[in-house]
Amino acid sequence: QSYLQSKLLKVICEANYFFYGGNEKGEKLVLSVILSWVYIFLVCMLVGTGVLGFFKKKQFSLIYYLVAGVIAITVYAEFFSLFGKTGACAHGILLAGALVAGFINRNRLRQIWQEYRGVLFSWEGFFYCCFAILIAFFTSRGEFHTDTNIYHAAAIRIYEEYGLVKGIGNLQLHYAYNSSYLAFASIFSFKWLIGQSLHTTTGFLETIMCLYAFHGLRDFVRHKNHVADMMRVGILLYTLVNVIRSMSPATDYATMYFALFIMTAWCTNLFEGESDLTEFSLLSVAAVFTATLKFSSCLLILIAVYPAVCLIRDKKWKEIGGYFFCGCII
């Protein structure tokens, strides 16, 4: 019996290392990173379709659903942290809400799958998968941002174990920065499940933004205007410079990726799209969210002037009220 128990314990330990493999340096196995990304992708996608599902007559590109999901989940984590820790209970409620949103918008999800299925099962999709594995490798091991060792990881742990603590900035000045990204990182840290924070959210954002850039650059030759293409190249260059720090849940990286995405999507809509006012308005709401990631990006909110003027000119008061409400909630 003792022999069987020891063998069973050995199997459990080996399985735990295979799926996680964490150590005191924050290193983890590539497989654990990829599995966490798949889960984060699915949850963000379900929540994002629930949020953008209010626009019943409009279909968005995949990245818009993911970004909407990230924003909505971050706002949820922030509000939940006012009352308790972002642990198993918070995650269970989030998952239940995501499943309900997915069920309600199942037809929209089916349309998205049919649109992108051909890309996934192609050489282009193979390249995307290889690139994701490459980023997963750097997310599994590398360097922490300096501020991560100072307060990022500690602030995430406070979210995980206590929630938002009133006046904590008096103990450590950096806690008072209160970046919303740390709330998002905490709810997908999975410490409540595996006993140690994974810190894979930066790599996730890095991957989806780079794939968004690659997908847009595939039609580079056919584009008459290359302003948006240069913005896509900017995303890739930023990743190239900071790829070895992909494992760090730093607020700087999330802020830059969202800022670059907003500028790229804005230029895409302006120069390659139909200058859709709805997309301009949603990107303005995303700019408000970016300011909550790091206040130094607050000037990005000035892009909201253009859609605001257009909406007021067309007397679309209902839409104005909706976007203003979203900005206040964020």
Q: Predicted segments — roles?
A:
Residues R106-L109, G118, L300-C328:
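Perimembrane helix-loop-helix junctions
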Residues L134-A228, S246-S248:
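Active-site lumenal/periplasmic loops and adjacent helix-entry segments of GT-C-fold
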Residues A96-A98, F261-M263, F289, L299-I312:
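Hydrophobic transmembrane alpha-helices of multi-pass, membrane-embedded glycosylation machinery
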Residues V221-R222, I262-E279:
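Membrane-interface transmembrane helices that cradle and orient dolichyl/undecaprenyl
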Residues K10-N16, G21-E115:
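Membrane-embedded, hydrophobic transmembrane alpha-helices
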Residues S140-E143, F184, G321-I330:
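Membrane-lumen/periplasm interface segments of specific transmembrane helices
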Residues Y76-S81, V243, T278-F295, L299-Y306:
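Membrane-interface alpha helices of multi-pass inner-membrane proteins
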Residues C89-A90, T200-L205, D229-I235, V241-T268:
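Multi-pass, polyprenyl lipid-linked donor-dependent membrane glycosyltransferases
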